[in-house]
């Protein structure tokens, strides 16, 4: 496992291309989901200096906060509520350039201005979401 990230200063695409194999190396051989999610959030936050990055995991009818990096976050989000709950319900990645313009946005922090939420699927079902705020 690599303990230090090699960060490059290129285009966003070049930065992501450089980071992906490093993240794969971080999680390779580790079977604990929480440990892997924690390392992924740390790597993304360090590489891109996002305001907040973390995971929510599906527990019955809501998303429950999982490993994250950043300020204190909302602990539970219902399906269809906010950007995370909507991405879960629609099984679609949502890119929101202005969170104030998103109907029903949940403001965990007024400092967050934009958000990307990526649903994580297995066998066609969402088991969690990756949430990134800038």
Where are these regions (language model features)?
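Intrinsically disordered, low-complexity terminal regulatory regions
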Residues: 1-67
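Short loop/turn motifs at secondary-structure junctions and domain boundaries
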Residues: 47, 107-112
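Short coil/loop residues immediately preceding or within conserved phosphate-binding loops
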Residues: 50, 115, 127
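A short, aliphatic-rich beta-strand micro-motif
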Residues: 114-121
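Short beta-strand-to-loop transition segments that serve as allosteric relay/switch motifs
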Residues: 129-134
């Amino acid at each position: 496992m690599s303990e230090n990230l090699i960060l490059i200063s290129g285009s966003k695409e070049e930065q992501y291309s450089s980071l992906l194999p490093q993240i794969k190396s971080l999680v390779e051989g580790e079977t604990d989901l929480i440990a892997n999610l924690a390392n992924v959030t740390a790597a993304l936050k360090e590489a891109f200096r996002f305001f907040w990055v973390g995971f929510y995991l599906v527990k019955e009818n809501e998303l429950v906060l999982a490993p994250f990096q950043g300020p204190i976050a909302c602990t539970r989000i219902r399906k269809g509520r906010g950007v995370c709950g909507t991405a879960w319900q629609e099984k679609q990645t949502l890119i929101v350039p202005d969170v104030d313009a998103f109907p029903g946005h949940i403001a965990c922090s007024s400092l967050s201005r934009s958000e990307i939420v990526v649903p994580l699927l297995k066998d066609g079902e969402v088991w969690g979401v990756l949430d990134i705020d800038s």
